Amino acid sequence: MKTTKDFWVMKNEGKKIVMITAYDYPSAKQAEQAGADIILVGDSLGNVVLGYDSTVYVTMEDMIHHGKAAKRGAPNTFIVADMPFMSCHLSIRDTLLNGARLIQETGAQAVKVEGADEMIPHIKALVRAGIPVVSHLGLTPQTAAVLGGFKVQGKDGEAARKMLEDVKECQEAGAFALVLECIPKQLAQEISTTLTIPTIGIGAGVHTDGQVLVYHDILTYGVNRAPKFVKAYANADQLMLKGLQDYADEVRSMNFPDDEHSFTMKEEELKTLYGGRG
């Protein structure tokens, strides 16, 4: 399993970091088999798996439940678990308690915290307590309503300068890596060059130190409409739907189960079932 130090080395050597967001045992297992460097158990599970229209409904219990499953599926991969909405905002004490729960109860190696500014003291507290932190800036889904919806961030000079200040503060607070979501590729390149910690982009161009996409988006699995920054590498929905339809057709036509998928008993044993009558 890689460590935080390994990711810094990868950045310095120009080796791209592959992160996949996965939410359960089978998806995490496949991500590990595919060679992902990091698995993110994201609070986007609220949208993708639980059917919510926002991540704000995701609870600590949800994150722990899914984090445990992902860890069982990928025991040899570095796992980052999201701190869900309001789990690290009310007080430093709450932040530490919730961060400790995520690490202890899921087996994750790190937590991810959205935002800068008022979150900086919380990041510092987590790091001081021995909990590795990934920061998340740009489009931060938990506060999308405040940002004016799901749209590209840092497009004008003032916003870009503020983001440059924010990422430096996150690094100084002790974050070992940074997720950059939905920002101009030029800004992402500038940030990646400026920081000593690795950057992982999602909708941030090719010049970040790594990339992250959601398992379901990569495979077109249960996805209604993917964002512009998503590239699908397979169509699982199409394949799975055909499999389910074929199953239903064979049940109705009595072609399933056939002899290959059924069990039998010896003829003499069958006779005893009927009291010896043949």
Swiss-Prot record:
It comes from Desulfitobacterium hafniense (strain DSM 10664 / DCB-2). GO terms for molecular function: 3-methyl-2-oxobutanoate hydroxymethyltransferase activity; magnesium ion binding. Pathway: Cofactor biosynthesis; (R)-pantothenate biosynthesis; (R)-pantoate from 3-methyl-2-oxobutanoate: step 1/2. It is found in: Cytoplasm. One of its GO terms (biological process) is pantothenate biosynthetic process. CDD domains: KPHMT-like (cd06557). Its cofactor is Mg(2+). It catalyses: 3-methyl-2-oxobutanoate + (6R)-5,10-methylene-5,6,7,8-tetrahydrofolate + H2O = 2-dehydropantoate + (6S)-5,6,7,8-tetrahydrofolate. This is 3-methyl-2-oxobutanoate hydroxymethyltransferase. Keywords: Cytoplasm, Magnesium, Metal-binding, Pantothenate biosynthesis, Transferase. Homodecamer; pentamer of dimers.
